[in-house]
Amino acid sequence: MRLEQLQAFLKVAELGSFQQAALQSEVTQSTISRQIQGLESALKCQLFHRGAQAKLTVAGELFLRRARKICQEWDVASEEISSLFQGKQTELCVAAIHSVCVSSLPSLLPKFCLGHPQIQLRVTALGSDRALKVLQDGLVDVAIIMSHRNLTNTKELAIKPLYEEQICILMASDHPLTTKKFITWENLGPYPQVIFKDGYRMRRLVEDEFSRREIPLNVSLELNIPEAFYGVVQGSEMIALMPQSLVTPVIDNPNFSVRYLFCPESGDRQDFRRQVSVVTTVDRLQIPPVAEFFNLVVDHYRCGALTVK
């Protein structure tokens, strides 16, 4: 059963004539006849009484309502898809890691909203694993996440690295470690740590680094809100390994100390950093507002939205 067969059926039913249906459809009468015959063959019944006027049979009357509904649904679907690729969608959903929501999106989002007043932006702060999952499940249009070695461009995903940033040690200003001129991985071992919950790639990055160095990771608390890290660290001997963008809000606060890890082998700062990328699906890049938002994010960071020290 094909759409043109249904359309031919509806036209004949409306006009009561194969000839008139052919004229209005700008095809030959034999074409209309073949389409109706094909439909009758598929349904295994006669749909019209052939005579001076084409009248619907009982089966034809029954089928008429269904055929109208099918064609109406097709028209609606065609219009919706056409509107989608013309950029007429009414909302755009973004999932982003907390640090991006705090540091960069507040200045970036108004630019998009100004150019697309008809689109409502919905932004959700999630861990990288969850953000990627909701993107792949079709619940959001764009995800801004922490990269990992298995995150590569595929036939389904379009990925653009945005920036890299150092991982810092956040601790209270009177923490015992602040007396050290240099802080190494081994120095961190004895102290309780606050880390991100499962589903956050920062947690995995920290766990992997401690494991690689065969240093026990003393986890005392799991959190997922940056502000909670500040409160816990400020009032205890707990420390937190956090990306630079998340320690920036408290870097000048006298209650905190922000330090970088030291590498004895090089005699310099330990190169412990993470990469952040923007991700969407390849098919979504064909939708104008999604492509524009994706490129806006890329350009935003290309212009130095984050200064990495």
Swiss-Prot record:
Residues 1-57 form the HTH lysR-type domain. Residues 18-38 bind DNA. Seems to regulate utilization of fixed nitrogen by controlling the expression of a certain gene(s) involved in nitrogen metabolism. Belongs to the LysR transcriptional regulatory family. One of its GO terms (molecular function) is DNA-binding transcription factor activity. The gene is ntcB. InterPro entries: HTH-type_LysR_regulators (IPR050950), LysR_subst-bd (IPR005119), Tscrpt_reg_HTH_LysR (IPR000847), WH-like_DNA-bd_sf (IPR036388), WH_DNA-bd_sf (IPR036390). Keywords: Activator, DNA-binding, Transcription, Transcription regulation. It holds the Pfam family HTH_1. One of its GO terms (biological process) is regulation of DNA-templated transcription. It comes from the Bacteria. This is Probable nitrogen assimilation transcriptional activator.
